[in-house]
Every structure is written in C-alpha cells, then in structure tokens.
C-alpha cells in the first residue's frame, strides 16, 4: 500500500519499512491529550502518531517526532509538510536515546508504538528489521521516556498483550490506564494500550473489541476512530 488517506491528512508510506497499522491508529486516537503543550513521538515512522495528535490538540501544542531511519524520516517530513499542522510538528532524524539525553525539553505526553519482536530471523530489508525488531527492551524505552517527562506528564504505549503485562510489573512508574484490545468478540486480548505516570492514580481498566460476532466494527471502535477513518 503506497498511501493511506484519513479525514484530515494523507500518509505516503512507500519508502517506510513499517506501514500504517491499526495499532498505531488506536494509540493515536486513544492517548489522553488533555492539557498537553509539548508532545514527543518516539520512533515516528511515517509520522502517523504526530499527525493524529496534532489533529486532536490545540494550536498552542507543539509536537516533536523522532525517527532514526533517514529514509522513513524523509517521508515523514513530507507527510508533515503536506498537512495543515506543519508549523506545529518538528521532525528530528536521530536515535531516540541520544535525543532524550541531549534535549532540555520536558513533555506532557510521550507516545510510542515501539518495535514488538525480539531479535530473530533477519529480515531481507534492513529498514524493516530495524522497525520490526527491538534490540532494546520495552522497559528501556519506558525508562528513557521517563527522563524527559514533566511532573504530571503521561507516557502511552501500544504493545502485545503479554509484553504489556510484563512492562507493568517491571517499571517503577505507575500504570494509570490500561485498555486490552481484542480483535474479535470471544477472542483473547492481543494488544494492550497503556498509560504510565510518575504520580500514583486510580488505575482505569477496560477493553476494546474491534469486530463483533458478525465481523462488523463495534460501536466502541467506530466511536474511538471516527475522526480519522474515512469509512466512519
């Protein structure tokens, strides 16, 4: 698929290793953007999350999107330039750990759709391997993000269900929101949307089912994503 058109922006992705996915769309629609003035997108890929969050936030909210792969970063910049939010999103082509160690900025919201899989059989495409396989643990990603999180800020990830459970147990941060994502009613959860904070809060837990028994989108999924998908 060379491109993906949403209601208010278009994503070109022919040069990007990892394409627009339901996981990314869920995170971009689900993350809590209240009171956000500065947002960080870790591992921006096509620029999808940065653009979704720009659509959902006020004009005074600035977004920094960091992407290591120069080819993906170039295409993400093109996608940003073609949007109405190009003056609110800054694309930075660098390693996320280096960026977090050198920036003085703190963020009210940090989002990531990190590489899911442990290093395994090499992909034929080096860029796809970089995007698909993690050489760092998800805990590392979370701990890096926490170093630049504002005192009342939030970190939101989308992860495989088991990886999400492991991360909750491993971190010293507080999990304040957890949504278990079920592809079809009656199935077990496959993904987990998570929000972490420095300060303890009452944990909000729920689930999101994408398809009902008739393979139709559920009302909950439509409600969450209707501002983005053309079909809703």
Curated annotation (Swiss-Prot):
Show the Gene3D superfamilies listed in the entry. Vaccinia Virus protein VP39
A Pfam family (short name) is: MTS
Q: What is its main location?
A: cytoplasm
**Which GO cellular component terms are attached?**
cytoplasm
Q: Name one GO biological process term.
A: tRNA processing
State which Enzyme Commission number(s) the record gives. Answer: 2.1.1.223
Q: Which GO terms describe its molecular function?
A: nucleic acid binding; tRNA (adenine-N6)-methyltransferase activity
Q: CDD domains in the record, alphabetically?
A: AdoMet_MTases (cd02440)
Localisation:
Cytoplasm
* Methyltransferase found in the keyword field: yes
Q: Which keywords accompany this UniProt record?
A: Cytoplasm, Methyltransferase, S-adenosyl-L-methionine, Transferase, tRNA processing
Q: Catalytic activity, per the record?
A: adenosine(37) in tRNA1(Val) + S-adenosyl-L-methionine = N(6)-methyladenosine(37) in tRNA1(Val) + S-adenosyl-L-homocysteine + H(+)
| HAMAP family, sorted | tRNA_methyltr_YfiC
Alphabetized PANTHER family for the sequence: TRNA1(VAL) (ADENINE(37)-N6)-METHYLTRANSFERASE
Family statement: Belongs to the methyltransferase superfamily. tRNA (adenine-N(6)-)-methyltransferase family.
Q: Tell me, in a sentence or two, what this protein's role is.
A: Specifically methylates the adenine in position 37 of tRNA(1)(Val) (anticodon cmo5UAC).
From the Swiss-Prot or TrEMBL record, give the protein name: tRNA1(Val) (adenine(37)-N6)-methyltransferase
Taxonomic placement: Bacteria, Pseudomonadati, Pseudomonadota, Gammaproteobacteria, Pasteurellales
